């Protein structure tokens, strides 16, 4: 007998091996029809998977996140099937699931056009309606290579040829189409009902710029039509809020080909940057951090000691001078350890919190660069806390509270926490990693927050806590991190004198709240659709005169506001007041002040708030109080 334990704790017994589909059928016809896959002892499998021993089983449907992933993975194969039906000469390569969808890369003799995409999507719908069964076959490697070579699929044959000879090869067949895949997949193509092809882009084979360029077709797929419609609506909103367009429209920044991945900040954009930096500097000072500055370029020997040269060199900009190799820093941490090491530290000095608005450079692939969101040169609100093991929980708890408070001030109320665990390529022993991961778990428990664990996503030197903020249109952005590092202090010889006069290694906590300033400012711009709150807006107030006779008074109002610390300017151009109001409204200025003869004579201003809200006429002092309240409350 085989005993199957279901998620509710109930057990079902079967006389012999049983498939996931058969278990679902034994529970009910409705569940059997809805089943897309199964989870056997935590492993995602096809509904045809045969269970041959006692196991825990969850039936996966389209109501589960895993179910939606299976739909998307299967839709990627449906896309490849349709392309092969319409364009037999096209060669298939890879087709993974990505956030909110999937893509598939093809080699074809000509570029796919928008008309091709429409035809492919139509063919996908036809194939889905045929409800062809999707079956898994197990092949040995050499036979699978021969199969794909006989089909003229050189890319697929190359992938399979790189797999160890003794490893089973899983192939999935639907109708006339067969593809390499680990699976799982839906039981039949009829389960795929809601999908849309989005765009075509270029992609190098195996991600290597030295290889041939392929065509990547992106698509999205969902369990329900209304989910897809909501997603497409969100994309429309995102298009309107694109920070690259806002940067140009609002004259904040630009990028150009001569400096790929580097930002040219214009005066107004730099005002926003400075507002954010000064705010963060104040928060860090209040939290007991000391601000430092470390060199941009350091010798290879330091990066070798830190492990960056071995583990991160492909992402570093390197140079040579006077027969010495140097690297531009991709991270600030080794420099901060040098400051810690400069002089003998005592346990009484700990925790030591060193903060730096550190400019870093990373050699990101040119194809991955994207406005402010993915750059090569960036500044981090970086800090490193050197502490004892006993201080980890208290320091992590304090950081967590600071991070949540900062996000709240910037208008982000929905924050999710994730714990990234050890990657395959890492420094340090398993024992060190066990200790580091459990240390962060203890800290999170002390903070009273819920978190999700992400195996394999940690940095090479330690596990990390990630803070994901949700913006106004529902997108999630990973910003802050807290990383526990037991490796770097040892590599770089950091130590302190303990209470018993012995030498000990400090624990090092790497932490950032905003992450990259550039990326965070991009997120802010898109979250607010460019209409930044008054405390962050580059121009908080514009004072406009109706006629030349009020110009002197308008200037005096601006000077008064500037003395109060506000970012104010005058528009004294000989233009119609309606033209001025419209122009500055499009620039999303929080407050527009209009002065005519009546306002001048009464020492007042006519106030318009953003969104064409007429607040009427008020004394300048009353407006100052209003703006002070907005800035202080971060409204």
Curated annotation (Swiss-Prot):
Zn(2+) binds at residues 333, 384, 510. SUPFAM superfamilies: Class II aaRS ABD-related, Class II aaRS and biotin synthetases, TGS-like, ThrRS/AlaRS common domain. Its cofactor is Zn(2+). GO terms for molecular function: ATP binding; metal ion binding; threonine-tRNA ligase activity; tRNA binding. One of its GO terms (biological process) is threonyl-tRNA aminoacylation. Its EC number is 6.1.1.3. SMART domains: tRNA_SAD (SM00863). Residues 242-533 are annotated as: Catalytic. This is Threonine--tRNA ligase. It comes from Cupriavidus taiwanensis (strain DSM 17343 / BCRC 17206 / CCUG 44338 / CIP 107171 / LMG 19424 / R1) (Ralstonia taiwanensis (strain LMG 19424)).
């Amino acid at each position: 007998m085989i005993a199957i334990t279901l998620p509710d704790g109930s057990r079902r017994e079967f006389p012999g091996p049983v498939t996931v589909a058969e278990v679902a059928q034994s529970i009910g016809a409705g569940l059997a029809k809805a089943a897309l896959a199964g989870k056997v002892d935590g492993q995602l499998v096809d509904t045809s998977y045969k269970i041959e021993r006692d196991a825990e089983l969850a039936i996966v449907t389209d109501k589960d996140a895993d179910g939606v992933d299976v739909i998307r993975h299967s839709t990627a194969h449906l896309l490849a099937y349709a392309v092969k039906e319409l364009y037999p000469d096209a060669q298939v390569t890879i087709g993974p699931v990505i956030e909110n969808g999937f893509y598939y890369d093809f080699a074809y003799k000509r570029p796919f056009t928008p008309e091709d995409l429409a035809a492919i999507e139509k063919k996908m719908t036809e194939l889905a309606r045929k409800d062809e069964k999707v079956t898994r076959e197990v092949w040995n490697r050499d036979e699978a290579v021969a199969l794909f070579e006989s089909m003229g699929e050189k890319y697929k044959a190359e992938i399979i040829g790189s797999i160890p000879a003794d490893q089973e090869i899983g192939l999935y067949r639907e109708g006339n189409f067969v593809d390499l895949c680990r699976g799982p997949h839906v039981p039949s193509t009829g389960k795929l009902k809601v999908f849309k092809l989005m765009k075509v882009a270029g992609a190098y084979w195996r991600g290597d710029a030295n290889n041939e360029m392929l065509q990547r077709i992106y698509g999205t797929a969902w369990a329900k039509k209304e989910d897809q419609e909501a997603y497409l609506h969100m994309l429309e909103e995102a298009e309107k809020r694109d920070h690259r367009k806002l940067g140009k429209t609002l004259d904040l920044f630009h990028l150009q080909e001569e400096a790929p991945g580097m930002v040219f900040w214009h005066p107004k954009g730099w005002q926003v940057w400075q507002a954010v930096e000064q705010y963060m500097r104040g928060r860090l000072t209040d939290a007991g951090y000391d601000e430092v500055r470390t060199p941009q370029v350091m010798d290879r020997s330091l990066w070798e000691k830190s492990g960056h040269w071995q583990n991160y060199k492909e992402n570093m900009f390197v140079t040579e001078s006077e027969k010495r190799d140097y690297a531009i820093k991709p991270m600030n941490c080794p420099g901060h350890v040098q400051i810690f090491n400069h002089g003998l530290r005592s346990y009484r000095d700990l925790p030591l919190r060193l903060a730096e608005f550190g400019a870093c450079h990373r050699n990101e692939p040119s194809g991955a660069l994207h406005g402010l969101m993915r750059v090569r040169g960036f500044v981090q609100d970086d800090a490193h806390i050197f502490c004892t093991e006993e201080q980890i929980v208290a320091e992590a708890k304090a950081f967590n509270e600071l991070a949540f408070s900062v996000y709240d001030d910037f208008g982000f109320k929905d924050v999710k926490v994730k714990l990234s665990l050890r990657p395959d390529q890492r420094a340090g022993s398993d024992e060190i990693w066990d200790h580091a991961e459990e240390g962060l778990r203890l800290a999170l428990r002390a903070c009273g927050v819920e978190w999700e664990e992400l195996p394999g996503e940690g940095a090479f030197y330690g596990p990390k806590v990630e803070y994901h903020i949700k913006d106004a249109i529902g997108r999630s952005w990973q910003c802050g991190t807290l990383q526990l590092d037991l490796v770097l202090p040892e590599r770089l010889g950091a130590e302190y004198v303990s209470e018993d006069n012995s030498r000990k290694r400090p624990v090092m906590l790497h932490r950032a709240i905003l992450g990259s300033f550039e990326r965070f400012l991009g997120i802010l711009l898109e979250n607010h659709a460019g209409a930044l709150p008054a405390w962050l807006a580059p121009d908080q107030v514009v004072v406009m005169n109706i006629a030349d006779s009020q110009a002197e008074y308008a200037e005096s109002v601006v000077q008064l506001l500037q003395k109060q610390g506000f970012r104010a300017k005058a528009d004294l151009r000989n233009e119609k007041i309606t033209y001025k109001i419209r122009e500055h409204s499009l620039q999303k200025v929080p407050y527009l002040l209009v002065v005519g003869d009546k306002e001048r004579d009464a020492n007042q201003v006519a106030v318009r708030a953003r969104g064409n809200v007429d607040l009427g006429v008020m004394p300048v002092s009353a407006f100052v109080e209003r703006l002070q309240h907005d800035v202080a409350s971060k409204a």
